[in-house]
Amino acid sequence: KKFLNDKIYWCASSTHEGEELIAAKAYLILKKKIKNLILIVIPRNVQRVSEITHMFSELGLKTHRHSLNKKIPTDTNIYIVDTYGETKVFFKVCKVVFLGKSLTLNGGQNPLEPARYNCTIIHGPNVSNFHEIYNLLGKNKIAFKVTNQNQMIKKINELLTKNIPTKNIKNKIDKIGDEILNKTFVEIKKFIRQ
């Protein structure tokens, strides 16, 4: 956490093959505009970490793996979370999260966990498993769909450089939940009356 104190950072979480490369290339462009920028990558499958680390190295990026439990070098570009069960720790400190399985694969990942931690969510168009939730989050400006790397860069730059409040995201989520629950009760009552 101390390492992040003077940094600006965003997270690419639950990433699948191909998405880490997109995030890393976006990072390289954003780094030219935003000083002290760090990308936190949380791959869905930690068995791919060696492959991911090598790919980042090929791009000239310096990485640090969370499992090393060592002091983080000051020239680190990408912090790789290669352990299970700690995602929420990083959601608590990140303002912006790209959720994977949405740019290169179909289905998407559940956006409610990062939203509960006041994260603004960026996702690709392939979110069929959570379509309704993403629509609700999109209408409430909690989640933003991007279809390519350029859109990702533009949206992340906007979210990190503009003073967009995120503290009320959890309140918006609670309100959305209440609305869904009320609609569900209305539908159940209709069904019971039949």
Model feature map: region roles:
Residues K1-Q194:
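Nucleotide-activated sugar donor-binding and catalytic core shared by glycosyltransferases
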